[in-house]
């Protein structure tokens, strides 16, 4: 399918002075695509040139349109010497290749230079004409949509979820080529950016081809990563979930389910049932076949004789029993046959999605993870990267075997990551073992099930907590009790997952961010010796991180972790571990016991006294946390019943079934009694420090909550004011007398101080919740630690809370107990904010007002020289002309915008930037350099979205931030990779007030320690 690419250079503005004599510039533009280059005329002596060039036309194959970026270079003309480069713009053409997306790219793009940053802007028009032919899609994958969001995109429904797709491409890193010794830093950086852009396009095209082979049309949960392997080369890899998506033809009835967080799906099934079975007769059969096909088709070779048979039978039995009663024997037989064939087609039953509709998950087994330490070698043939493929295949096989051991046939919330230091690379993969509902997958879209009403009678909301494995043959030791909700099935005492909290999960109280942090020193060594040391340390680090998470979960009085993400980062002389998750109290699981400290025996009297004092403090902390997070209602009746918490909760929530099961449950629960206390044995200094770290964990200040999932469990009255921010901090360690204890303290202080600074800067948004808190840890130099965090602050309001219908009966009572602890005060923001309009995830109709400009400007210090502030004004004048009411492109890591409805997805934004400086001190040191660079990244992302006609970026993530510094030479370099989905949204408040109501301008930037707000 060849195509014609047409480019027009319109004008430039705010160009830098290149001629010192006249304080002006003689600018012209080179437009390059593939091997063809066009030039505009030179516009003499102007900082705001008006080229108005003719249309430059490139006749290229559609394969090149996907692989190659459009390169626009702005130069200053010199008569007697080489032309000076002002900067470049890379434009991805792929969004124009979708049938439903933008037809033209038109807007002002920041002109970016890797040494000087943003140097003015250029107005560009880009169009693509595609010609259909008989070989359509043979070499290209035009038309395949990519989404970063880890749930089915709003305004779409899933016809079929096909499954896991992965690909990687490798090449030599220009930074380590011999020519790099003689070329300028600018040329080296630009060569690197150009190569990464090419590899990214090639990777997307190859993944798209795999999707087309599976008869899909989209990739959801697309995660692309860059592995900078130094002299070994450069690897770009990606994973995702292939789907067949259908655009909702009449989005009006689906408004509640299209524009809200995961809790929105509570009402989605009933809305979608208004037009049932519109697609169940045709695509439904392959859907059940394809989706449930993810029961593992292959096993580890050492288990093939037994595991293959067992697991291939499991889905057939489940599907047959689930469908026979209603669909008849013939359909059941057909279903079995289709499932069996699908099982043979799929190798890895993985899903990169983290958010699902109700009843999609039948059971959740727990977190499965695998790590491997590898030695990097030079990539001899970039076209055949078998070595890297084999490495990841080993990891995925191990994940699959772990899921099987838990009695599960699929892995959801799956992700992969690497950590590289010199020749050593740690490969990591994790996910949540799960059993999926084939009936749901066959006859429903993944954003709302058509036959959910009939399905919900069999699987109760607590069903996903029930164990999927055999109680008599458990894969690991666990304390099992009967489910506190249904009293019929067994549940574990705690549940760890990598997914978001299911929308219908019974939760008591609010959630909170729980982090485990760990550092370990190691000896400096090379090659195999280094890899051996790291391999021996990894299991102990994972065990300690798990123990920390368990202790902190008990200290909060909670029993479930969601959104768990564990990072292991390797440096020359240390290993860092950071685990982040959102703790919740699941009412289906038993009440967690306390933490009991056991001292050494025999011991001195003063030591015993110290132990008892610490025990008292721990008990007080647990009680305080239960009050803070409103986890106290079930404990009221505990003493009167004589059995643990499940009995009174059953009496409160399920009166009709309490009489049937109370005797049996009491008998079973009494066997556990109050022995649930988690014993911490203090037998050395490390154990004592672990206990102290528990007690010194600082809770958020009054008015703040935090979580790393999209929405905080237990809060349903959001106000449509969001504030996204990114922050990067680097600390240098004193190498003298560095021990594990001091290293741990420094790392803990770094993370805690980072959170405290965010609370301080956002203090005027109280009551406020930090959602989607995403930490990334790196060891850029031998004696430094870098932590980057991206999150979004959302306000919530007490006044409307009483009017919002609560989806769970446990919440109304605790909400009235202590308003100060619930932090639901009237919003105190500037006049830019709207009135008391709120948005409830349960109700699902969000509203949007102005950005909280005044609030954040009071809470943060503004950097007047930041290009982001200028970009706000620039975007108002150009770029987003199709949406006159838009003043600034919103950015959020969430998959939705509170108070708004996403009407169109315009394509994926995947950008890689390099910034280098030889005057670090003059630019404000590390903080000023990082802050300015992050602001420039924000400005460039906004410009590309506005040029597509969009007004927001959702599912935004800063996937990489690699900082390197040479303080002696006053030099620094930073690499940032960001991605997200460009969208068009309509504000609910704008629809009600009419199109003439403008939105308030957004905030600009925060300026301390490399922080940025957007």
From Swiss-Prot:
- In terms of superkingdom, the source organism counts as Eukaryota
PROSITE patterns on file: C2
According to its UniProt entry, one GO biological process term is: intracellular protein transmembrane transport
For bias kind Low complexity, which ranges apply?
293-318, 993-1006
Residues holding Ca(2+) 3: 78, 81, 84
| A Pfam family reported for this protein in Swiss-Prot or TrEMBL | C2
List where Polar residues composition bias occurs: 275-292, 830-840
> How many cofactors are bound and how?
Binds 3 Ca(2+) ions per C2 domain.
Using the UniProt record, give the first listed, main subcellular location. membrane
Q: Which GO terms describe its molecular function?
A: calcium ion binding; calcium-dependent phospholipid binding
Q: Which residues bind Ca(2+) 1?
A: 19, 26, 76, 78
Among PANTHER family, the record links this protein to: C2 DOMAIN-CONTAINING PROTEIN 5
Q: What does this protein do?
A: May be required for insulin-stimulated glucose transport and glucose transporter SLC2A4/GLUT4 translocation from intracellular glucose storage vesicle (GSV) to the plasma membrane (PM) in adipocytes. May bind phospholipid membranes in a calcium-dependent manner.
Record protein name field:
C2 domain-containing protein 5
């Amino acid at each position: 399918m060849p195509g014609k690419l047409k480019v027009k250079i319109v004008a430039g503005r705010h160009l830098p002075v290149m001629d010192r004599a006249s304080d002006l510039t003689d600018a012209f533009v080179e437009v390059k695509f593939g091997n063809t280059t066009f030039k505009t005329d030179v516009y003499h002596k102007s900082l705001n040139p008006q080229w108005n060039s003719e249309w430059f036309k490139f006749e290229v194959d559609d394969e090149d349109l996907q692989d190659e970026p459009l390169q626009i270079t702005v130069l200053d003309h010199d008569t007697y010497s080489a032309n000076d480069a002002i900067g470049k713009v890379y434009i991805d053409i792929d969004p124009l290749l979708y049938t439903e997306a933008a037809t033209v790219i038109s807007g002002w793009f920041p002109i970016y230079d890797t040494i000087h940053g943003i140097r003015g802007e250029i107005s560009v028009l880009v169009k693509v004409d595609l010609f259909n032919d008989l070989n359509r899609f043979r070499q290209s994958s035009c038309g395949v949509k990519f989404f970063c969001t880890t749930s089915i995109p709003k305004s779409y429904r899933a016809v079929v979820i096909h499954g896991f797709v992965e690909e990687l491409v490798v090449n030599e890193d220009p930074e380590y080529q011999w020519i790099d010794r003689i070329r300028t830093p600018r040329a080296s950086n630009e060569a690197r950016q150009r190569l990464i852009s090419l590899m990214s396009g090639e990777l997307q095209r190859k993944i798209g081809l795999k999707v087309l082979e599976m008869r899909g049309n989209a990739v959801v949960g697309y995660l692309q990563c860059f592995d900078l392997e130094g002299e070994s080369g450069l690897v770009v890899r990606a994973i995702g979930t292939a789907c067949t998506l259908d655009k909702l033809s009449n989005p009006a009835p689906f408004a509640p389910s299209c524009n809200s967080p995961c809790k929105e799906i509570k009402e989605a099934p009933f809305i979608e049932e208004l037009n049932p079975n519109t697609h169940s007769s045709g695509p439904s059969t392959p859907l059940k076949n394809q989706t449930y096909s993810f029961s593992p088709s292959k096993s580890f070779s050492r288990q093939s004789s037994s595991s293959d048979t067992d697991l291939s039978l499991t889905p057939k039995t489940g599907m047959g029993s689930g469908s026979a009663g209603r669909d008849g024997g013939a359909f059941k037989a057909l279903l079995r046959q289709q499932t069996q064939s699908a099982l043979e087609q799929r190798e890895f039953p993985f899903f990169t999605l983290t958010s699902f509709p109700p009843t999609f998950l039948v059971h959740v087994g727990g977190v499965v993870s695998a790590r491997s330490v590898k030695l990097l070698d030079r990539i001899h043939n970039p076209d055949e990267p078998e070595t890297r493929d084999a490495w990841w295949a080993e990891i995925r096989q191990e994940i699959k075997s772990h899921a099987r051991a838990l009695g599960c046939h699929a892995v959801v919330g799956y992700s992969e990551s690497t950590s590289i230091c010199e020749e050593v690379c740690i490969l990591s993969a994790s996910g949540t073992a799960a059993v999926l509902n084939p009936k749901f997958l066959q006859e429903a879209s993944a954003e709302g099930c058509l036959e959910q009403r009939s399905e919900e009678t069999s699987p109760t909301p607590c069903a996903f907590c029930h164990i999927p494995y055999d109680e008599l043959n458990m894969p690991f030791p666990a304390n099992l009790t009967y489910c506190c909700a249904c009293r019929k099935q067994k549940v574990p005492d705690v549940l760890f997952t990598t997914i978001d909290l299911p929308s219908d999960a019974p939760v008591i109280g609010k959630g909170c961010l729980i982090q485990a942090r760990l550092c370990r020193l190691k000896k400096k060594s090379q090659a195999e010796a280094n890899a051996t040391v790291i391999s021996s340390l990894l299991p102990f680090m994972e065990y300690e991180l798990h123990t920390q998470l368990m202790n902190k979960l008990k200290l909060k009085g909670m029993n479930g972790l969601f959104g768990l993400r564990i990072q292991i980062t390797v440096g020359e002389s240390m290993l860092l571990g950071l685990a982040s998750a959102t703790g919740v109290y699941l009412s289906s699981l038993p009440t967690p016991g306390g933490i009991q400290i056991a001292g050494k025996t025999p011991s001195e009297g003063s030591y015993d006294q110290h132990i008892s004092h610490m025990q008292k403090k721990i008990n007080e902390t647990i009680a305080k946390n239960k009050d803070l997070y409103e986890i106290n209602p079930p404990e009221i009746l505990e003493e009167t019943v004589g059995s643990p918490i499940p009995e009174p909760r059953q009496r409160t929530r399920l009166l009709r079934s309490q009489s049937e099961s109370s005797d049996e449950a009491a008998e079973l629960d009494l066997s556990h009694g109050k022995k649930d206390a988690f014993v911490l044995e203090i037998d050395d200094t490390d154990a004592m420090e672990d206990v102290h770290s528990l007690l010194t964990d600082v809770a958020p200040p009054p008015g703040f909550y935090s979580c790393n999932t999209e929405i905080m469990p237990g809060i349903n009255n959001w106000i449509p004011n969001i504030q996204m921010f990114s922050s990067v901090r680097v600390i240098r360690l004193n190498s003298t007398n560095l021990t594990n204890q001091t290293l741990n303290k420094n790392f803990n202080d770094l993370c805690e101080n980072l959170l405290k600074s965010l609370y301080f800067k956002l203090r005027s948004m109280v009551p406020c919740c930090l959602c989607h808190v995403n930490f990334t840890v790196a060891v850029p130099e031998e004696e430094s630690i870098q932590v980057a965090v991206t999150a979004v602050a959302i306000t919530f309001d007490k006044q409307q809370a009483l009017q919002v219908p609560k989806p769970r009966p446990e919440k109304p009572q605790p909400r009235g107990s202590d308003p100060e602890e619930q932090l639901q005060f009237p919003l105190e923001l500037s006049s830019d904010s709207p009135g008391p309009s709120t948005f409830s995830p349960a109700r699902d109709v969000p509203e949007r007002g102005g950005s909280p400009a005044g609030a954040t400007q009071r809470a943060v210090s503004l950097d007047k020289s930041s290009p982001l502030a200028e970009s706000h004004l620039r975007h108002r004048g150009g770029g987003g002309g199709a949406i006159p009411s838009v003043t600034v492109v919103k950015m959020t890591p969430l998959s939705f915008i509170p108070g708004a409805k996403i009407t169109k997805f315009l394509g994926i934004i995947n950008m890689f930037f390099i910034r280098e400086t030889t005057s670090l001190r003059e630019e404000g040191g590390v903080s000023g350099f990082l802050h300015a660079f992050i602001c420039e990244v924000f400005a460039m992302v906004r410009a590309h979205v506005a040029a597509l006609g969009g007004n927001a970026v959702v599912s935004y993530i800063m996937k990489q931030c690699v900082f390197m510094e040479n303080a002696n030479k006053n030099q620094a370099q930073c690499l940032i990779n960001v991605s997200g989905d460009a969208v068009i949204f309509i504000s609910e408040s704008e629809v009600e007030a009419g199109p003439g109501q403008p939105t308030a301008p957004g905030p600009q930037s925060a300026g301390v320690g490399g922080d940025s707000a957007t």
